[in-house]
Swiss-Prot record:
Transmembrane segments: none annotated. Belongs to the universal ribosomal protein uL18 family. Component of the ribosome, a large ribonucleoprotein complex responsible for the synthesis of proteins in the cell. The small ribosomal subunit (SSU) binds messenger RNAs (mRNAs) and translates the encoded message by selecting cognate aminoacyl-transfer RNA (tRNA) molecules. The large subunit (LSU) contains the ribosomal catalytic site termed the peptidyl transferase center (PTC), which catalyzes the formation of peptide bonds, thereby polymerizing the amino acids delivered by tRNAs into a polypeptide chain. This is Large ribosomal subunit protein uL18. GO terms for molecular function: 5S rRNA binding; structural constituent of ribosome. The lineage of its organism: Eukaryota, Viridiplantae, Streptophyta, Embryophyta, Tracheophyta. It comes from Solanum melongena (Eggplant).
Length: 121
């Protein structure tokens, strides 16, 4: 087994670098499960990538990386601000002000008969 000998097989390595394993898998899926191939490799199909031109694509990509290895900035959409379902906690002062506001509203609505609880006896 090659694991023990720690020897790097150049041909195998080359195959992986150029996506040979992907191309092989694409061929297997094409023959055995065409619908799975369609869904699994939909972006490849859109990009017009077939198993036989994957190696070409990788060679082009590698050739393009060599002159300028710095990653290209892609145009990303700015993240959307998410709606907060849990409201921010109010400070003690804000809670106190709200309570006073509620009490005032209750008193105004109740016509200021604060002592009606004692009259029920």
């Amino acid at each position: 087994s090659s694991k023990d000998s720690k020897q790097l097989d150049a041909e195998v390595h080359r195959k992986y670098i150029y996506g040979g394993h992907v191309a092989a898998y694409m061929n297997i899926l094409m023959e055995d499960e065409p619908e799975k191939y369609q869904s699994h490799f939909s972006s490849y199909i859109k990009a017009d990538l077939a198993p036989d031109n994957i190696e070409e694509m990788y060679k082009k990509v590698h050739a393009a990386i060599r002159p300028d290895p710095s990653p290209k900035k892609s145009q990303k959409q700015p993240p959307k601000t998410h709606k907060r379902y849990n409201l921010k906690k109010l400070t003690y002062e804000e809670r106190k002000a709200k309570l006073i506001e509620r009490l005032n509203a209750l008193n105004a609505a109740g016509g200021n008969d604060d002592d009606d609880e004692e009259d029920d006896e």
